[in-house]
Amino acid sequence: MTISEARLSPQVNLLPIKRHSNEEVEETAAILKKRTIDNEKCKDSDPGFGSLQRRLLQQLYGTLPTDEKIIFTYLQDCQQEIDRIIKQSIIQKESHSVILVGPRQSYKTYLLDYELSLLQQSYKEQFITIRLNGFIHSEQTAINGIATQLEQQLQKIHGSEEKIDDTSLETISSGSLTEVFEKILLLLDSTTKTRNEDSGEVDRESITKITVVFIFDEIDTFAGPVRQTLLYNLFDMVEHSRVPVCIFGCTTKLNILEYLEKRVKSRFSQRVIYMPQIQNLDDMVDAVRNLLTVRSEISPWVSQWNETLEKELSDPRSNLNRHIRMNFETFRSLPTLKNSIIPLVATSKNFGSLCTAIKSCSFLDIYNKNQLSNNLTGRLQSLSDLELAILISAARVALRAKDGSFNFNLAYAEYEKMIKAINSRIPTVAPTTNVGTGQSTFSIDNTIKLWLKKDVKNVWENLVQLDFFTEKSAVGLRDNATAAFYASNYQFQGTMIPFDLRSYQMQIILQELRRIIPKSNMYYSWTQL
C-alpha cells in the first residue's frame, strides 16, 4: 500500500440492524390468523360462551351502556361530589368551576363522562359539552375548538334546518381574545331552547337557558406565566355570564393552585377534588370483582362463571389472589392488572379454557414477564455500539457533575476524548520495506471511527425516546410553579434554548451499567472512572 493510499480513511463496516425477515412476519401472521379462525369456530359452536366473552371484554374495556356501568367502591364518594356539581349546573342553572387532581388513569375523565351520559338521557337539550386538551390545543387553537364545538352542538339542539342569526358562527373565532369571548357570551346569552307544551287547550311556552360544560384535560398546560389569558376569560365567564357555565379541569399537578395567577385565582372557586386511590387490598379485590362479575343473564354460563370467580377471589392462596396482592404491593395500579386480564379473556376458546386460565393465571405470569423485559436493562441490550458509547459517556459526565446533570455537548466531548484515548493506543501506520523492490509500504490497523457531532444527534434523540435520559425539568419537585414552567418550556420571551444545551439527567447510573454490560464488550473499561 502506498503512502497516498495510507492517508485515506479506513473503510468502516457498519453492522446491519437485525430485522425480521418476510418469512418470519408471514409465519407469525398465519399463526395469528389461524388462532382467530379457531376462536371464531368455537364461538359459533357455543354461542353462549361468545356472549359471555363479549360481555367480559365490554366490562374490561369500559364500553358497557351507561345504566349498566358499575363505579368502584373507593370512587363512589368522589362520584357523588361530581354528580352534585353537574346537577346544580345543568338542572338548577348554577355556575361552577372545579379542578380534579389525580395521577393518570385515575378515572377523572371516566367519571365526568359517566355523569354526563346519565344526564344526557333526561336533559339532552339543556346542556352542551366542550372538550379541550392541553396536549393538543394551544391558546389560539383552543379558541377555534370552542367556536367549532359550539357551532356543531348548538345546531344539533336547534336542528339542522334552523339557522342561528344572532351571531355569525363562522366568524366567532376571528379577532382578539377579548372580542372572541364577547362573541361567545353574546351567542350563549341569546341562545335559548323554546318548547311548546300542550296541556289540553292551554299552550305554555317555556324558555330554558343552555348550560355550557367545559372539560379541560391537562389544564396545567394553560396555566403558565404567558398562557393564562384563556383561563382568565373562562373563569370570568363563570362569575359574570348570565348563561350557566361549568368548568372541569383535569390535571396531575398536586400544586395546581400555585400555577394560577392572582387574577385567575380570584375568579376560581377554589374547589379542588383529589381523586381517591386504592388504600387497602380489600379495595383492590373488590374492584377486580366488579370488573369480572357478570350481572345480567346473557348466557347459561353466567352463574357458573360468577361462582368460579368468587371462589378464586375468596381463596387467599389462589393464583388470581396472588397476582392481585403482587400488584397491590408493587404498582398498585388497577389499569395494569386489567390490561393483563384482557388477553386472558380474549384468547380463551371455550368456557372450560377460560375457567382453567383464570385458575392457573399462567397468562398473567407471561404478561408480567413480558412487561418486565421492556425495562431499561432489556432496552440496554438492544443498543448499537455507538448508542452504548454515547450512553456511557453521558453517565461518566453525570457522575462527575455536582447535580448529576449533563447536556449533549458535554457528553459528546467525553465520547470524543475516550475514542481518541483508545485510538492513541492502536498503532495506525507500521512501515515495512519490500526486499525485492526496495519500496516502502504501510499496513494500517483498523481504529474506532469518531463520528461527527451532527451524526450523533440522531443517536441522542433515540436514547431520549428510550427513556435513558430525562429532561431535568421532569425530575423532582420545583420550588414553585413558575420555576417548573421556566424549566420545562424553552420558548420564553422570544428566545429558545438550543438542542445541545438542554439539561438532562440519567435514569441508569454508571455503576449499574458496569453490572449489565458484559466484560467482553469493548466499552466495558469506560464504565469505571
Curated annotation (Swiss-Prot):
Coiled-coil residues: none
For this chain, one GO molecular function annotation is: DNA replication origin binding
Q: Where in the cell is it found?
A: Nucleus
- Provide the Gene Ontology terms for cellular component: DNA replication preinitiation complex; nuclear origin of replication recognition complex; nuclear pre-replicative complex; nucleoplasm; nucleus
* The UniProt record lists the keyword Nucleus: yes
Q: Which SUPFAM superfamilies match?
A: P-loop containing nucleoside triphosphate hydrolases
UniProt xrefs under Gene3D superfamilies: P-loop containing nucleotide triphosphate hydrolases
The record describes the protein's role as:
Component of the origin recognition complex (ORC) that binds origins of replication. It has a role in both chromosomal replication and mating type transcriptional silencing. Binds to the ARS consensus sequence (ACS) of origins of replication.
PANTHER family assigned:
ORIGIN RECOGNITION COMPLEX SUBUNIT 4
The identity of this protein, by name, is Origin recognition complex subunit 4
Species in which this protein is naturally found: Saccharomyces cerevisiae (strain ATCC 204508 / S288c)
